[in-house]
Regions:
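Right-handed parallel beta-helix
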Residues: 17, 64-76, 98-115, 133-145, ...
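Short, intrinsically disordered, charge-balanced linker/junction segments flanking boundaries
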Residues: 1, 172, 177-181
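Flexible, solvent-exposed loop segments that connect beta-strands
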Residues: 80-85, 116-121, 176
Length: 181
């Protein structure tokens, strides 16, 4: 599964960012997502941009997962890395409609790039949903780009559902048709 970051196939109760690197013990109440930014990055080649040599960030194939206070950045997928069931650069959801979901709260998805040119697999560099459910609560989708079919988010089937609440979409773009958001 070349070009992929984290793959989720089971339920994950919660991934929470915002902890100091100097935290000790078991007290999980001392979180500050603004002061202690937790980053999941696809920037494998270390050049602080999403391009060839980098990888996609999160593939949700099954299960329910909740993520709070995490920044996702520099995810990248090329035409060569994309397949019919795995083609996202940021968060890609491809599971059963009833048993696959992800909920993001107070997160940022930024600077992800989909260089995929095949129409069925292009677009949605921040969030691409083939099948399953995505809930975005106070999520910022910033400066993501694609060749076409959605500069930030793409729902690609009748079993793909995205709910957005209090989200910001800014600076997202694509070179083709079907929407910049």
């Amino acid at each position: 599964e070349s070009g992929l970051g984290v793959i989720v196939r089971k339920n994950v109760k919660a991934i929470k960012g915002g902890y100091s690197q100097f935290s000790e013990g078991t007290d999980v109440s001392a979180r500050d997502i603004d002061a202690y930014v937790t980053v999941i990055s696809g920037d494998v080649n270390g050049n602080k941009q999403a391009d060839a040599g980098d990888c996609g960030l999160l593939l949700v194939k099954k299960g329910h997962i909740a993520i709070e206070g995490v920044t996702f950045q520099y995810g990248y997928v090329s035409e060569a890395d994309a397949s019919t069931t795995e083609c996202g650069s940021g968060i890609y959801v491809s599971g059963g409609a009833g048993d696959t979901s992800i909920e993001l709260t107070d997160c940022v998805i930024r600077d992800c790039t989909s260089a995929v040119t095949t129409s069925a697999k292009q677009g949605g560099p921040a969030v691409f949903v083939l099948s399953g459910q995505v809930r975005l609560n106070k999520v910022n989708l910033l400066d993501n780009k694609a060749v076409g079919r959605g500069g930030a988010v793409r729902c690609s089937s009748k079993t793909a559902v995205v709910f957005m609440n209090g989200c910001l979409l800014k600076g997202n773009s694509h070179n083709g048709s079907w929407g910049n958001g």
